[in-house]
Amino acid sequence: NVDFNSESTRRKKKQKEIVDLXNSL
């Protein structure tokens, strides 16, 4: 469960970074 939550958090963080990158272009 903890591993799943960690994976989910990492995925959301990565997605946010991608969105931020796109917005900066």
UniProtKB/Swiss-Prot annotation:
Record PTM: Contains 8 disulfide bonds.
Cellular component per GO, a single term: extracellular region
Gene Ontology terms describing biological process: defense response
Membrane-traversing stretches: none
Subcellular location: Secreted
UniProtKB keywords: Disulfide bond, Secreted, Toxin
Region (Disordered): 1-25
Tissue-specificity statement: Expressed by the venom gland.
One MF term in the entry's GO annotations: toxin activity
Domain of life according to the entry: Eukaryota
Main location (coarse class): secreted
UniProt family annotation: Belongs to the CRISP family.
Additional information: Not toxic when administered to crickets at doses up to 5 nmol/g.
Name this polypeptide is given: Cysteine-rich venom protein 25
Provenance organism: Naja haje haje (Egyptian cobra)
